[in-house]
Amino acid sequence: MPQVLLIRSLAQLRLFTEHHVFAVWDFMQLLKSLQELLAPAGVPWVPPRYPRLAGLINDLVAAEECDCLPIELGGPCYLSHFSLYRAAMQEIGADTCPIDAVLAVAAHEGLDRAMLHPAIPEPSRRFMQSTRSLIESGQPHHLAAAFCYGRELLVPDLFRALLDQVHLHQLHAPTLSWYFERHISLDGDNHGPLAEQMVAELCEGRLGTLSEVDAVRKRVIRERDAFWESIAAVLQQASDLQPLSSPSADQGPVGSAVVACDPEALAR
């Protein structure tokens, strides 16, 4: 289990999101790559090899790409969790320019070029490079193991620890708070068990495959630990110690608690 991040100021919270947003984006690379292997969208269509897993992965993608927001955040409307996270960053005055620049390069020049962008913090780049190497293996059970053990089963505890430690006030960062709570609920109660089923079905009891899955499990947990530790080191260097519960004007603009349900606006 990665160490608990100590976030004591609004500046540190902003800094955390500016690093972590790349992991949120990286999650979608992993998820969509797994979908491409289990439920390919190409033409001509052929029946999927694992029909039940095709259904599972499509359900997971739908929840991540088009979740319904509650009324208090401007809903009901549909947004991807990535767009929601970006809106949460804007709400607390975090800098979205780096992730926006990387997305622009990815859209026009491809992911490999985007991964070289100097705006990516080094801890985030190392974390994404590891995911990229797993994706390039093209092995469904490798990707499913990374998704299960490095994301779905791990994230609820990570986010719960953040919420318990940071105590986000609803007027302070309601969108970020809802994002964390949503993932704790979805991943803990639904997506985590589905991910475990996916791994089990892909392995089908084969000892060699199970051994590979265990190696991936250890690797992704180790890399998540390293990512969290690197962020912790960066946060320790943040000098703004203004308490989270009392944001002040000199800390910069803190946005509205209502998310604009305009995907194109959120993408800018």
Model-derived segments and spans:
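Non-heme di-metal
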Residues: 1-261, 266
